[in-house]
Amino acid sequence: MKKSQFFASVSSASSLTFKGIGGSFVLLSVALLASCKDDDNSDPQPKEVDPTVAAQYYTGGELGTSFLVSSSAYEQPTPVVDQMGLSRVFLRGEKMFEKPFTANHLGGEREGLGPLYLRTSCLHCHPGYGHGQSQPDGMFNTNEVGNGYLLVVYNPDNDAYVTWLAGMPQGHAVAPFKSPLDESKIALTWHDYTDHWNNTFPDGETYSLRYPEVELPREAVYVINQGYEDATTNHYEVRLESTIGIYGTGLLDAIPDDSITAQWAKEENAFKRGFIKDFRTGWFADGQWQADGGAYYTNKVQGDGSPHVRRYTYAMSRGPLMDAAGTNAIWNITNVTRSDRRYHYLDLNGKIYATYASKDPEVQAGFPDYIRQVTTAEEHPEFFTANVEENIFNYLTSKNLPAEMSDDDYIAFAVWHRGLAVPAARNIEDDDIQKGRRLFTQIGCAQCHRPSWTTGDDEVYDPNLFTVQDAKSPYFGKTLASLMPRYPKQTIWPYTDMVQHKLYMKNDIRTGWCRTTPLWGRGLHQTCSGSPYADRLHDCRARNVVEAIMWHAANEGGTSDATHAVEGFRNLSKEERAKLVAFVNAI
């Protein structure tokens, strides 16, 4: 049977292909088997499908796609994980993601939580391994599993983060320490929004739009309550950013730097010719990255400062995956130290919280019992002197804390992260979905949501230069990068150009610049997370695909380069809009 016929028969039979640790297998539906009647021995004749269409089922390429589309679709390993004999390591890393961390004095398999933290586990922010869920009006409660929101507190004059909180501000602390933010005093409110088309398509169909607003009063901030003041403590703004899906990030890591550079050069050319009006000229000019403008990602703390093309987070704050959101987040979300990060994630200043916490009488009273659960006077005499204020300050600002996560656990986490597959596209050969695909391109969506990329040799880079130091580890002396699953020469379908753009939305993202979010797999968000909404865009304001599209041309304070595509969407018939939406949900 031809490959194109195989895909057609699988789709028409409503079959399920399960991708697991040990490989894959296909379960054809009873309907297909029953169609072979006793008096009719002829094989069913599947619909012929264009091979180029059939290939689009492999969103992550042949090495990075899973064909499970149930509630655990985002949790599957790539075929490479099994091929490289990494299945056990993958499962160990999976536990690091799913299971909660506990404080040192509570015992347990995963100790080291705190002294400050955002969540006790990664799964809190990534329900079903996907995008965070929008939260209802009311108190900002990060104890709710599924609340993937992170607060962004910044100076509106220059878009710089305030220095008296962490870049990802913590709402929890292990006693006797006090949380940097009192979440009970933070309020989330949703507001209805009416766009310049009165939320109405030309054919009369209407839609709804909403946006979030967060109130963070001064009295919710610990260091301000303790007496800290600077120019921003009375002049700051707050935005929400949601976590994104983590499946397939290893495949994005396998895209060569020069391919991403070529895409930026292409869009710079469009900017120079007047086809688009917004472009990050401070980062990229005349076909070159502007190192002086901070365009490259570098790590000069653990690494050697080598420059790398940025590719992760909305702000494109990270480069290669081995030193990006996942490997960094499991440290700063939990404050669990490891051999390459023997220090705490506090405020951006590094000493403001430590200064005020060390002077807090209640913290001082509980610190001696706390520190005995962490280390000993023999290992760290500077935490056990007669001056408790100095002890607390020394502990909070130390760069030589005990490693609470083993090297083997960290490696397992990294293998798991880079080993997550992308769910296959669904029903992509359906006539209506193919019509939606053509419309997606015709009206201009594909200009930013670039459909496909080709991975390179996938020489894994780690700006962190992590090498296993534990002599008892089976990986002793090996680098983290050398142990990772790899995805060379794959055609993948993420639907992103890996470039930042501006959408000019009400209560927009900090700076206004946001990387084009990959669309692959997002249609399964509600299935995998249990959310009542599709939770699209950076702050989950869009409850469905239509809302997400229309926000691309809200044009608050500027005109988005996506406006022409949105206008094209508006002018489609109701049936055509439905087909385009079905396509977006199918990929």
Positions of the model-derived regions?
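Extracytoplasmic redox metalloprotein regions
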Residues: 68-69, 75-89, 98-409
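Bacterial Sec-dependent N-terminal signal peptides
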Residues: 3-4, 26, 30-57
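The canonical Cys-X-X-Cys-His
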Residues: 117-129, 246, 413, 436, ...
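N-terminal regions that are enriched for targeting/export leaders
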Residues: 48-77, 90, 94
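Glycine-biased, low-complexity coil/linker segments
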Residues: 19-20
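An acidic, gly/pro-interrupted, aromatic-rich
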Residues: 230-255, 259, 263-266, 485-558
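Electrostatic cytochrome c docking/interface patches
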Residues: 72-113, 402, 409-441, 455-456, ...
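Extracellular low-complexity, Gly/Ser/Thr-rich intrinsically disordered linkers
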Residues: 350-422, 432-438, 514-587
